[in-house]
């Protein structure tokens, strides 16, 4: 397996030289964004074991040696950034309706854990009952510089000013610039406009362009070069990847972090092709798998 990966990386070597001139340099050895690193990104925390996007989910991911914890951001009616995947409250809480129509005080009254016990009775635990929806501030207060953050701006068109609020929080917690280690925070989004805005506000803050399967089906070299003007990497649906398009993305000097990879065989195949990390609900599993590479 290691031999397969070495061969794939050798084929890409000429393209990877261009990585030195990406908007945010990521080639220094030991840097979290080095193409030599294989990153474990805990998708919504250790969400295969614990209710997603809860402090407990992130704590569990840390114990499982995840390199990054992933945060999806939504904004409340009163302008507070909370960590939740969906724009609506219904799936992961006992509330109903759109996040944007509720204040933070309203959302703090909700149970964000019991749904997991009901959906996955084989994984149910009493301590999941009553878990709360965390704010971005609460997550940064809890983990500070002791975690690396992979943060998605969700639905930025719905939440004007989200990017500025996010950057202000990162600055407050000294997670930008000289106060942080290179690559400690990565911003991702399906919205090119949101990432370009982040890049304009903070040129040294790494961004990753998320890609749907249909976008991968029509991906071109020109499109990848455009992504490279504002991002250090691409985050496609792993099911849309094959050896050829992995090689194409990497040849443009972009990091490649597909989502959401939960099967061990898929992990091995993607690593053999040359991805530089994955999003997974099972960070402990991927941490074990990548040791062979």
From Swiss-Prot:
One of its GO terms (molecular function) is metal ion binding. Pfam families: GDPD. Residues 1-26 form the signal peptide. Its main location: secreted. GO terms for biological process: cell wall organization; glycerol metabolic process; lipid metabolic process. PROSITE patterns: GP_PDE. Keywords: Calcium, Cell wall biogenesis/degradation, Glycerol metabolism, Hydrolase, Metal-binding, Secreted, Signal, Stress response. It is an enzyme of class 3 (hydrolase). Disruption phenotype: Deletion mutant retains WTA and ceases growth upon phosphate limitation. Mutants show altered cell morphologies and effects on autolytic activity and antibiotic susceptibilities that, unexpectedly, also occur in phosphate-replete conditions. Induction: Transcriptionally regulated by PhoP. One of its GO terms (cellular component) is extracellular region. Its cofactor is Ca(2+). The keyword Transmembrane helix does not apply. It catalyses: a sn-glycero-3-phosphodiester + H2O = an alcohol + sn-glycerol 3-phosphate + H(+). It is found in: Secreted. Residues 38-290 form the GP-PDE domain. Belongs to the glycerophosphoryl diester phosphodiesterase family. Glycerophosphodiester phosphodiesterase hydrolyzes glycerophosphodiesters into glycerol-3-phosphate (G3P) and the corresponding alcohol. Involved in wall teichoic acid (WTA) metabolism during phosphate starvation. Catalyzes the degradation of WTA, enabling the utilization of WTA as a phosphate reserve under limiting conditions. Is highly selective for the poly(gylcerol phosphate) WTA backbone and catalyzes exolytic cleavage of individual monomer units. In vitro is active toward the WTA oligomer mimics glycerophosphoglycerol (GPG) and bis-glycerophosphoglycerol (bGPG). This is Glycerophosphodiester phosphodiesterase.
